[in-house]
């Protein structure tokens, strides 16, 4: 009687230490001695979010150190990679340790293209946050139309961008640098840490009729 041999998982280590935000964990290979069709996947208590795509162990969206999703929230994920040929299943346990990486602050929900009606002073609210929870502040840092704007602060991390002119901008008579009604502004967010990591965002503010 012919014996069906199990699939063989190769080139997959038993442990990995990776920086956060990485989605592609490891590439490996699977062969079947009888060339049977294989089902390859991931199981285990920490397997939510993991998948195998073309023999790549993958985590959807990248592993986040600040918001671990492993079962005991310690940033150590233990999963089982399996290969099943319909007769036999081969498995390999893999432990993945996630390391913290300093991350720059973020402008929350702010798009680089902003639209504001003419004669309206407040252009857009601003909210900034640091992924690690450090203090953060923001301000106007540049842009050819910088002189036409100011900040209105609620606190260090929240506020608004506004025209200096209380009447806002005139659609019919734009006063931006090239008179096209699209105002160019640059805003900067910076962490209150020794590293002072920063994020700079270029804004295009279009005044509408």
Model-derived regions: residue spans:
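Acidic, turn/loop-rich segments in luminal/extracellular domains of secretory-pathway
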Residues: 1-3, 7, 13-23, 27-37, ...
């Amino acid at each position: 009687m012919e014996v069906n041999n199990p699939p063989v998982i190769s080139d997959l280590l038993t442990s990995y230490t990776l920086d956060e935000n990485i989605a592609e964990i490891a590439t490996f290979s699977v062969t079947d001695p009888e060339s049977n069709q294989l089902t390859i996947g991931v199981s285990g208590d920490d397997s939510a979010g993991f998948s195998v795509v073309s023999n790549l162990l993958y985590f959807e969206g990248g592993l986040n150190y600040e918001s671990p999703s492993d079962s005991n929230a310690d940033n150590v994920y233990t999963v089982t990679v399996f290969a099943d040929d319909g007769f036999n299943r081969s498995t390999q346990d893999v432990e993945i340790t996630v390391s913290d990486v300093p991350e720059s602050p973020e402008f929350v929900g702010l798009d680089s293209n902003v639209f504001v009606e003419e004669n309206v002073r407040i252009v857009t609210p601003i909210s900034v946050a640091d992924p690690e929870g450090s203090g953060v502040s923001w301000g106007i840092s540049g842009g050819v139309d910088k002189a036409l704007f100011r900040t209105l602060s609620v606190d260090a991390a929240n506020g608004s961008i506004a025209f200096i002119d209380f009447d806002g901008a005139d659609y019919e008579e734009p006063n931006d640098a090239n008179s096209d009604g699209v105002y160019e502004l640059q805003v900067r967010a910076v962490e209150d840490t020794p590293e002072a990591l920063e994020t700079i965002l270029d804004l295009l503010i279009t005044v509408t009729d």
